[in-house]
């Protein structure tokens, strides 16, 4: 069995090596000719899976995407061909939620404006939006959720309108899929008019898709309003973001909010489980066996951490400033965006760091944030 796999997908060899011959390929430049003899195709969001790519293949048994979203996959075409498909919903939700939370802590420190006491509006209450809300609520932050689709589906959580978030939230974090048509389309959800209407001193965080915000309009509005603070992990026209926009963001990164080792492993592992199910064989590999030991054994806390100390704990796990600096230095280079994504192998989730502290009742929130070992 020939397994064609994006060369940047981690842990493929230990998971799929026993199932067939693994053929690594460049996902962004993948051609129909390369796919021709594949039995299994494993991709990431940089690969457009459609008739143009697959029409010359009559052997394909499974297509898997190690991503939350599926907007890069023609699901109708796969269904017409009776080709089984699976993605990895929620695989990197924890990573995205922690990224957004860490970014907010970093902004709070940079501008001496504590996160505690602010109101955060989350637009899109799916896996990543929910994970962001979980972090914020663990820390005691008031969260407003906007998701008209989930509200209409009967989701029991309390939702508010986007207008309410615009009026009441100090921070707005975007977590919607990209949809270009329909009543709730999200392309340019934040157009020039909506960007201009942001209340003074709003922090805007985008970890979903670049064209949820009109990037040209964002440049124009930001140049007029220095009070707006931006955290941008996603960009229109990836992998070539508008060079005028990057310097206007407080933190800028190349679509890596979900790129924790745990999240990457989880995505590949979910596809492994699905393929085993399809082949009717036992999935006998373990997710935990894939992850390396964290380089800090444990951190002992003398007292419950304040916000500054919490940021330091977060930086032990992931220092956003490092990726921001690297991105600014490399994004204009040829392939700089993709090279940084490919080589992004260092980030862990809060669960990798064990905390030791006797005063359990005072730090339950640290456990709820995701840190391990608290009070043990």
Swiss-Prot record:
Record bears the keyword Nucleotide-binding: no
One CC-aspect GO term: cytoplasm
GO molecular function terms listed in the Swiss-Prot or TrEMBL record: 4-phosphoerythronate dehydrogenase activity; NAD binding; protein dimerization activity
Sequence positions that bind substrate: 45, 67, 259
Protein's pathway: Cofactor biosynthesis; pyridoxine 5'-phosphate biosynthesis; pyridoxine 5'-phosphate from D-erythrose 4-phosphate: step 2/5
Main location: cytoplasm
One biological process term in Gene Ontology: pyridoxine biosynthetic process
Residue numbers annotated as active site: 209, 238, 255 (proton donor)
Primary enzyme class: oxidoreductase
Classification via PROSITE patterns: D_2_HYDROXYACID_DH_3 (PS00671)
A Pfam family annotated for this UniProt entry: 2-Hacid_dh_C
UniProt keyword annotations, A-Z: Cytoplasm, NAD, Oxidoreductase, Pyridoxine biosynthesis
Localization of this protein: Cytoplasm
Catalytic reaction list: 4-phospho-D-erythronate + NAD(+) = (R)-3-hydroxy-2-oxo-4-phosphooxybutanoate + NADH + H(+)
PANTHER family: D-ISOMER SPECIFIC 2-HYDROXYACID DEHYDROGENASE CATALYTIC DOMAIN-CONTAINING PROTEIN-RELATED, D-ISOMER SPECIFIC 2-HYDROXYACID DEHYDROGENASE FAMILY PROTEIN (AFU_ORTHOLOGUE AFUA_1G13630)
Described function: Catalyzes the oxidation of erythronate-4-phosphate to 3-hydroxy-2-oxo-4-phosphonooxybutanoate.
Assembly notes: Homodimer.
Name of the featured protein: Erythronate-4-phosphate dehydrogenase
Organism encoding this protein: Shewanella baltica (strain OS155 / ATCC BAA-1091)
């Amino acid at each position: 069995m020939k397994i064609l796999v994006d060369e940047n997908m981690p842990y493929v060899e230990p998971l799929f090596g026993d199932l067939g011959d693994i053929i690594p390929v460049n996902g962004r430049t993948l051609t129909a000719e390369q796919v021709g003899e594949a039995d299994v195709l494993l991709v990431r969001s940089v690969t457009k899976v459609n008739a143009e790519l697959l029409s010359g293949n009559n052997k394909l048994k499974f297509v898997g995407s190690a991503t939350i979203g599926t907007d890069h996959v023609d699901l109708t075409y796969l269904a017409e061909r009776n080709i089984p498909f699976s993605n990895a919903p929620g695989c990197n939700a924890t990573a995205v939620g922690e990224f957004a939370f860490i970014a907010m802590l970093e902004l709070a420190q940079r501008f001496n404006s504590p996160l505690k006491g602010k109101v955060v509006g989350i637009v899109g209450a799916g896996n990543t939006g929910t994970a962001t809300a979980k972090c914020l609520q663990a820390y005691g932050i008031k969260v407003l959720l906007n998701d008209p689709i989930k509200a209409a589906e009967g989701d029991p959580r309390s939702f508010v309108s986007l207008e309410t978030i615009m009026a009441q939230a100090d921070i707005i974090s975007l977590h919607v899929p990209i949809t270009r048509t329909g009543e709730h389309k999200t392309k340019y959800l934040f157009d020039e008019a909506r960007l201009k209407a942001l209340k003074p001193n709003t922090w805007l965080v985008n970890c979903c898709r670049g064209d949820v915000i009109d990037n040209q309009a964002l440049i124009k509005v930001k140049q007029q309003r220095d009070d707006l603070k931006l955290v941008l992990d996603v960009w229109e026209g990836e992998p070539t973001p508008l060079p005028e926009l990057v310097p206007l963001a407080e933190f800028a990164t190349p679509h890596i909010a979900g790129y924790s080792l745990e999240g990457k492993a989880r995505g590949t592992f979910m596809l492994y489980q699905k393929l085993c199910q399809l082949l009717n064989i036992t999935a006998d590999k373990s997710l935990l066996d894939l992850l390396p030991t964290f380089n800090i054994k444990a951190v002992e806390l003398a007292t419950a951490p304040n916000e500054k100390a919490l940021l330091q704990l977060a930086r032990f796990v992931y220092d956003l400033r490092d990726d921001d600096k690297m991105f600014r230095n490399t994004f204009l280079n040829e392939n700089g965006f993709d090279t940084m994504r490919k080589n992004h192998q260092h980030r862990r989730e809060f669960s990798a760091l064990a905390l030791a502290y006797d005063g359990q009742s005072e730090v339950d929130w640290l456990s709820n944030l995701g840190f391990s070992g608290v009070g043990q």
